[in-house]
UniProtKB/Swiss-Prot annotation:
Domain notes: Modular enzyme with four functionally distinct domains. The isolated Hcy-binding domain catalyzes methyl transfer from free methylcobalamin to homocysteine. The Hcy-binding domain in association with the pterin-binding domain catalyzes the methylation of cob(I)alamin by methyltetrahydrofolate and the methylation of homocysteine. The B12-binding domain binds the cofactor. The AdoMet activation domain binds S-adenosyl-L-methionine. Under aerobic conditions cob(I)alamin can be converted to inactive cob(II)alamin.
Family: Belongs to the vitamin-B12 dependent methionine synthase family.
Protein's gene: metH
Designated name of the protein: Methionine synthase
Domain Hcy-binding: start-end pairs: 2-325
Species lineage: Bacteria, Pseudomonadati, Pseudomonadota, Gammaproteobacteria, Enterobacterales
Residues the entry annotates as binding Zn(2+): C247, C310, C311
Cofactor(s) in the UniProt record: methylcob(III)alamin; Zn(2+)
MF (Gene Ontology): cobalamin binding; methionine synthase activity; zinc ion binding
Organism: Salmonella typhimurium (strain LT2 / SGSC1412 / ATCC 700720)
Segment forming the signal sequence: none
EC top class named in words: transferase
Length: 1227
């Protein structure tokens, strides 16, 4: 061990060390331009280089050195080289693959020089350099092509080659450690570990390795789907000095995962989170002191050995963290119990106290004729179903074997494993790669991100090959099955079994350094009852060898192919299952840890018929000489199999249940087929019809509510349950009316979308969820004035009022409703929800105007708990008190909150506008000037749909298409996706929804912060003026943007243009939704609105593409996929009034006037400038190559006054419309 490494370990044992912060964040603050990235050397490089931050070590080394020094000055002990994207793979984006080694070397050398300088200043605090290996821009375990899940655009070997080149340069440049960071795909990281170890061996060095992964969102998983512990298990073989987490999340969100890692990691733990989560404008709001306070709590809890920062963090953050952890004890390395720690997407730990582990055997071409046929016929989808069935039947590992003479075993193994990676319900378990061919094994290992098992290696080809293979397996990070097989052949007696296993164990642990807990012995299971006397003791020999191995070879595990033992009875499944059950009963008692079995055909020992169990035990334990004959005689009695009729009867079993259970089943499963029939049967059994609702129907809905609350049902299922409930209630209503009875409920709530707002999807979902929990909902619809809400609440004697809104003017209307409730003496709770609402706005603006309980509800899933607490005699007072205390804290924090960046005057902001050289740029001439109506069919638009927000509407979190394979919500997401596409088919075929729109292109020029729009090319007659706002916070390295900056100034003499558009998913949206509501079908009511919303957005995307390629025509050859369109990989923008770049809603009126929108489309604006129908989009078109989306964010009084003057509005009106953007207190 080098003195540097010894120093580092000594420091880690004494205190919490500090890593640096965000490199990209700091580079951005330097406001570098294209020429800065190029320098002299790359002045003529054939592609743009701005954004290639790693190149700056060659073209602007003084900037990188200054950042390193700033972090050292802030207290960092370790700095990271500026090489996050320096592999040949990532550098290919800039055609700089050949410079990868040079950049890595220069970066390490630069960081080394800075570290040495600071160490010389304070020798008692040595500084270290971590050579960074980033994740690359490719994923080895995820297909980039949704249509080909087995496809990969990078291989393990390509990653290894790239990482080796980078590692060599980093080491030679002077790095003290290698940091493999921001791991979002564990297979990439396994390739990095493999490469680093290989290169260390070639260079004759052994530096410490640091590993840091990324939990991407609230699911608690990496991008490639692994949990924290699965991720750790997969890379534990690296024997890293540190293991940690970074990026994607802030301290609040990351805490639980760092805590989990601290619990399971035998090594030191690191964390370098982001400065909170990015806000709606992509900025990081968590200030240094707040972040440091959170990090200190982590340190006090004993989670940390090293801490630093990632995105959004600066030297200020690192300095605050350094002070926060100073003097606190570092995390002590825990004493972790010895266990074989495997992983798929989830961990599987096999220790001394573990139960028997089932290894699924049916994905083996040598053992399953069906699976072999499917693979040979390349029916991989059906082959995946075989694997899925094994996992669903209880297999904790699946064994995969492709060794068949007529198969390309390597290709079949790679394809099947690649497909499994895209099936979370299969990939959650570890993989056992089973082959007698080393080449197949190695190909398979390069495909799995988890820690799997190789089945198998042995000493049959001699010790040299055995050691060579074992070392490679260790480097790949796999556990290994070792067959009891040596140069003399397979062990068939108890003595030979332990002799070979003992010898292999000694070689593996002493010569190879293989962890004993990752050694799994297979002492050979052979068939019994063959009629050959020498075979009679085979089972007993195996069972005895299990006892020997456990006694002599500490921590080693034992496995075996269980079906081998019953091979003599193939074709007689009941007897084979009995043999397996008895064999396992005794083998497990003697130490067998796992077995390759058909997980769907495991009998229970105690459930076997006594005569069959006794006869099988005679054979397994070799208790009688005539055991084989007796079992053969008995076997025919038990031959047989389940019939299709029996299977069908079992499938329809629920229809034979009593009516109460049938109703519950229909409600939970969302089945409407039998609901009237079963409801009638329940009515016949009840004394009064109301009892059916209050009894079995509500009992069933309570089950639905419980399952939803526990996360075992998802919103689309709940809405389907509500549809079943409503149909049952509708059936009963005439009978209830006749009896003049009314049912009881848990409470009554009036809900409404406030005046001026037409959006109601979220409100509808909340209503359905509450109805599922026996609350009576009075839904007043959309655009409801305050007086109607309050009048209805009094008339129906409501227990609560709920307000919803999507557009920012709705926030003011909610304040108005609260004031009216106070004036009229209401005391019932007021609930606030909707896309633009927030806890902060509720606390600061709404709650203070109403003395009754006022509660912000973030989403539908939280509504039930809030409503239940507010209406509970025992919980209400405490809940209200806690909420009020929380909101008071929010108000205090809001009052104290200072902007992350200070405001500037409007004059200063204008001086820092987009400094564009208009002399060197000629704006493209629009091909089709004027206003045109446009239509697009649903079939055209469905190709432009961004499905991710659709799933968000239904509270299913995840990005499309990955959400369809999500382990938690994937099955429901698939059902929902199918229903949505079925609805699209219906809407299209029957022309029930007809998207329409209008577009216009006009001559235009900038005048100050406004845009004059002209009637024609003479530019003498101004049709209208589009007014815009400018960013008004201090921008270091960036312009203070205003949308007008993207249009040529009038004084430049350049002729420029602007476009405007308005589109809707269809005027028929509300009528369709109302029709479904009349049928008591909330599910399809919400579905049609959600689809109309997606069609409107798709229409906006489609029309923008047509504008770029045809109407304006500045990008006629553009050819982008839908994914690229969603990522906005094109020139130009289409900002919408009411959104961050132009947040003032009344500008929609300018578009309506300019395009005569209502005449051409039927679309309307409400008094709050909400668009009707709700599924509508409108906005502007800009063509400028540097046009971009941005957030105006907070503005000051001088700009509000100026804007009011330009618009001809009062300052008070402008302040009302721009309330969320005011950087001052207008009151």
């Amino acid at each position: 061990m080098s003195s540097k490494v010894e120093q580092l370990r000594a420091q880690l044992n004494e205190r919490i060390l500090v890593l640096d912060g965000g490199m990209g964040t700091m580079i951005q603050s330097y406001r570098l331009h294209e020429e800065d990235f190029r320098g002299e050397r790359f002045a003529d490089w054939p592609c743009d280089l701005k954004g290639n931050n790693d190149l700056l070590v060659l073209s602007k080394p003084e900037v990188i050195a200054a950042i390193h020094n700033a972090y050292f000055e802030a207290g960092a002990d370790i700095i990271e080289t500026n090489t996050f994207n320096s592999t040949t793979i990532a550098m290919a984006d800039y055609r700089m693959e050949s410079l990868s080694a040079e950049i890595n070397y220069a970066a390490a050398k630069l960081a080394r020089a800075c570290a040495d300088e600071w160490t010389a200043r304070t020798p008692e605090k040595p500084r270290f350099v971590a050579g960074v290996l980033g994740p690359t821009n490719r994923t080895a375990s995820i297909s980039p092509d949704v249509n080909d899940p087995a496809f990969r655009n990078i291989t393990f070997d390509q990653l290894v080659a790239a990482y080796r080149e980078s590692t060599k340069a980093l080491v030679e440049g002077g790095a003290d450690l290698i940091l493999i960071e921001t791991v979002f795909d564990t297979l990439n990281a396994k390739a990095a570990v493999f490469a680093v170890k290989e290169e260390f061996e070639a260079l004759g060095v052994d530096l410490p390795i640091m590993i840091s992964g990324t939990i991407t969102d609230a699911s608690g998983r990496t991008l490639s789907g692994q949990t924290t512990e699965a991720f750790y298990n997969s890379l534990r073989h690296a024997e890293a000095l540190t293991f940690g987490l970074n990026c994607a999340l802030g301290p609040d969100e990351l805490r639980q995962y760092v805590q989990e890692l601290s619990r399971i990691a035998e090594c030191y733990v690191t964390a370098h989170p982001n400065a909170g989560l990015p806000n709606a404008f992509g900025e990081y709001d968590l200030d240094a002191d707040t972040m440091a306070k959170q990090i200190r709590e982590w340190a006090e809890a004993g989670f940390l050995n090293i801490v630093g920062g990632c995105c959004g963090t600066t030297p200020e953050h690192i300095a605050a963290m350094s002070r926060a952890v100073a003097g606190l004890l570092p995390r002590q390395l825990p004493d972790i119990p010895v266990a074989c720690r495997l992983s798929g997407l989830e961990p599987l730990n096999i220790g001394d106290d573990s139960l028997f582990v089932n290894v699924g055997e049916r994905t083996n071409v040598t053992g399953s004729a069906k699976f072999k046929r499917l693979i040979k016929e390349e029916k991989y989808s059906e082959a995946l179903d075989v694997a899925r069935q094994q996992v669903e039947s209880g297999a904790q590992i699946i064994d995969i074997n492709m060794d068949e003479g007529m198969l390309d075993a390597e290709a079949a193994m790679v394809r099947f494993l690649s497909l499994i990676a895209g099936e979370p319900d299969i990939a959650r378990v570890p993989i056992m790669i089973d082959s007698s061919k080393w080449e197949v094994i190695e190909k398979g290992l390069k495909c799995i991100q988890g820690k799997g098992i190789v089945n198998s290696i042995s000493m049959k080809e001699g010790v040299e090959a055995f050691i060579h293979h074992a070392k490679l397996l260790r480097r790949y990070g796999a556990a290994v099955v070792v067959m009891a097989f040596d140069e003399q052949g397979q062990a068939d007696t108890r003595a030979r079994k332990i002799e070979i296993c003992r010898r292999a164990y000694k070689i593996l642990t002493e010569e190879v350094g293989f962890p004993p807990e990752d050694i799994i012995f297979d002492p050979n299971i052979f068939a019994v009852a063959t009629g050959i006397e020498e075979h009679n003791n085979y089972a007993q020999d195996f069972i005895g060898a299990c006892e020997d191995i456990k006694r002599e070879l500490p921590h080693a595990l034992i496995s075996g192919g269980v079906s081998n033992v019953s091979f003599s009875f193939r074709g007689n499944d009941p007897v084979r299952e009995a043999i397996h059950a008895v064999f396992l009963y005794y083998a497990i008692r003697n130490g067998m840890d796992m077995g390759i079995v058909n997980a769907g055909q495991l009998a229970i020992y105690d459930d076997l018929p006594a005569e069959l169990r006794d006869a099988v035990e005679d054979v397994i334990l070799n208790r009688r000489d005539d055991g084989t004959e007796r079992l053969l005689d008995l076997a025919e009695k038990y031959r047989g199999s389940k019939t299709d009729e029996a299977a069908n009867a079992q499938q329809a079993e629920w229809r034979s249940w009593d009516v109460k259970k049938r109703l519950e089943y229909s409600l939970v499963k969302g089945i409407t087929e039998f609901i009237e029939q079963d409801t009638e049967e329940a009515r016949q059994q009840a004394a009064r019809p109301i009892e059916v609702i209050e009894g079995p129907l509500m009992d069933g809905m309570n089950v639905v509510g419980d399952l939803f609350g526990e996360g075992k049902m998802f919103l689309p299922q709940v809405v389907k349950s509500a549809r079943v409930m409503k149909q049952a209630v509708a059936y009963l209503e005439p009978f209830i009316e006749a009896s003049k009875e009314k049912g009881s409920s848990n409470g009554k709530m009036v809900i409404a979308t406030v005046k001026g707002d037409v959006h109601d999807i979220g409100k509808n979902i909340v209503g359905v969820v509450l109805q599922c929990n026996n609350y009576e909902i009075v839904d007043l619809g959309v655009m409801v004035p305050a007086e109607k809400i309050l009048r209805t609440a009094r008339e129906v004697n409501a227990d609560l009022i709920g307000l919803s809104g999507l557009i920012t003017p709705s926030l003011d209307e909610m304040v108005n409703v609260a004031k009216e409730m106070e004036r009229q003496g209401f005391t019932i709770p007021l609930l606030i929800g909707g896309a633009t609402t927030s806890k902060a706005h509720t606390a600061v603006k709404i709650e203070q105007n109403y003395s009754g309980p006022t509660v912000y509800v973030q989403n539908a899933s939280r509504t039930v708990g809030v409503v239940a607490a507010l209406l509970s005699d025992t919980q209400r007072d405490d809940f209200v008190a806690r909420t009020r205390k929380e909101y008071e804290t929010v108000r205090i924090q809001h009052a104290r909150k200072k902007p992350r960046t200070p405001p500037v005057t409007l004059e200063a902001a204008r001086d820092n506008d987009l400094a564009f050289d208009w002399e060197r740029y000629t704006p493209p001439v629009a091909h089709r000037l004027g206003v045109q109506e446009v239509e697009a069919s649903i079939e055209t638009l469905r190709n432009y749909i961004d499905w991710t927000p659709f799933f968000m509407t239904w509270s299913l979190a995840g990005k499309y298409p990955r959400i369809l394979e999500d382990e938690v919500v994937g099955v429901e997401a698939q059902r929902l996706f199918k229903d949505a596409n079925d609805m699209l088919d219906k809407l299209s075929a029957e022309k029930l929804l007809n998207p329409r729109g209008v577009v216009g292109l006009f001559p235009a020029n900038r005048v100050g912060d406004d845009i004059e729009i002209y009637r024609d090319e003479t530019r003498t007659h101004v049709l209208t003026v589009s007014h815009h706002l400018r960013q008004q916070t201090e921008k270091v390295g960036f312009a203070n943007y205003c949308l007008a900056d993207f249009v040529a100034p009038k004084l430049s003499g350049k002729a420029d243009y602007i476009g405007a558009f308005a589109v809707t998913g269809g005027l028929e949206e509300d009528a369709l939704a109302d029709a479904f509501e009349a049928q008591h079908d909330d599910y399809n009511k919400i579905m049609v609105k959600a689809i109309a919303d997606r069609l409107a957005e798709a229409f906006a995307e489609y029309l923008h593409e047509r504008v770029r390629k045809v109407y304006w025509g500045y990008a006629p050859n553009e050819s982008l996929s839908n994914d690229e369109l969603i990522r906005e990989n094109y020139q130009g923008i289409r900002p919408a009034p009411g959104y961050p770049a132009c947040p003032e809603h009344t500008e929609k009126g300018t578009i309506w006037q300019l395009l005569d929108v209502e005449k051409h489309t039927g679309m309307k604006l409400t008094e709050s400038f909400a668009m009707w129908p709700g599924a509508s989009v409108s906005g502007w078109y800009f063509s400028h190559p540097e046009s971009k989306y941005f957030a105006v964010a907070q503005i000051q009084r001088d700009q509000v006054t100026d804007y009011a003057f330009r618009k001809g509005m009062s300052v008070e009106d402008v302040e009302r419309w721009l309330a969320p953007n005011l950087g001052y207190d207008a009151d």
